[in-house]
Regions:
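Conserved class I S-adenosyl-L-methionine
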Residues: 28-40
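A short SAM/SAH-binding and catalytic strip from SAM-dependent methyltransferases
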Residues: 128-143
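Conserved beta-strand signature within the Rossmann-like core of class I S-adenosyl-L-methionine
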Residues: 156-170
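Class I S-adenosyl-L-methionine
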Residues: 188-225
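A short glycine-rich, Lys/Arg-flanked "PGG" loop and its adjoining helix->strand segment in the class I
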Residues: 143-159
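A short acidic, Gly/Pro-enriched loop at the edge of an enzyme's catalytic core
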Residues: 117-130
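Class I SAM-dependent methyltransferase SAM/SAH-binding core
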Residues: 41-114
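Class I SAM-dependent methyltransferase Rossmann-like catalytic core
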Residues: 1-28, 50-54
């Protein structure tokens, strides 16, 4: 999706500088990065590997090409980055780990909040420094979002930051409810709106006059204590 260029720009403008700041040897550590509802990792390719829209398209040009990620994973002020990916698709998780996009994977139906995998997801969220969740929160129940955000804000780095997307024109009331949850638990940093993808014929019939689905990109940070 063309929107990953804009996710990359938001990441570079508002998240990367926080973790690129000079730190003493005593505080040097691994940056824990969580891709929530990661699918096959396009946004991680954009944010951590610096790949643009055309490069990501080229990555998926054939079954051989997609097995090599050309650009290396970035570091933050020489701190290593550990990537945890969480998604319902075992195929996506296997791919991401095989090609080196992900270090740890959790296959989880996030709306099943009694599963062991959901507990593992909450543990990952509580240890996260950076979380991205792009064009995916709409699929999660509000109770799931509430629990995951609570796990994030009660653990991990004081500088924890998050990049999320809201789809438009779909499920706008749910998007508003999700925003209220996020703003209760996190501080707002920045936002922008972008194109996401062309709408299908059925979608255009359901939303007359619309040709593109849009994304609203938000960056948030943990509230200062």
């Amino acid at each position: 999706y063309v929107s990953d260029d804009f996710n990359q720009q938001m990441f570079e403008a508002h998240i990367a500088p926080v973790f690129d700041e000079k730190s003493s040897a005593a505080t040097k550590k691994t940056i824990n990065y969580v891709d929530l509802c990661s699918c096959f990792g396009n946004t991680t390719m954009a944010t951590l590997h610096g790949m643009g829209y055309e490069e990501i398209r080229d990555n998926w040009s054939n079954e051989t090409r997609c097995m090599t990620i050309d650009k290396p994973r970035r570091t933050f002020n020489d701190q290593s980055t550990a990537v945890t990916a969480i998604d319902i698709s075992p195929q996506a998780m296997k791919y991401g780990k095989t090609v080196g996009l992900y270090d740890t994977t959790i296959v989880c139906d996030l709306n099943n909040r009694t599963s062991n995998e959901f507990k593992l997801t909450k543990d990952a969220m509580s240890n996260a420094d950076i979380i991205i969740s792009t064009a995916s929160l709409v699929y999660l129940e509000l109770e799931t979002i509430e629990e995951l955000m609570e796990a994030f804000v009660t653990g991990g780095s004081e500088n924890g930051m998050m990049l999320v997307n809201f789809l438009n024109p779909f499920a706008l009331e749910k998007a508003d409810a999700t925003k209220r949850i996020l703003l209760q638990k996190l501080d707002f940093v920045a936002s922008r709106a972008t194109r996401h993808r062309r709408m299908s014929k059925l979608e255009q019939d359901n939303y007359p006059g619309e040709e593109w689905s849009l994304l609203e990109l938000w960056v948030l940070q943990k509230k200062k204590k």
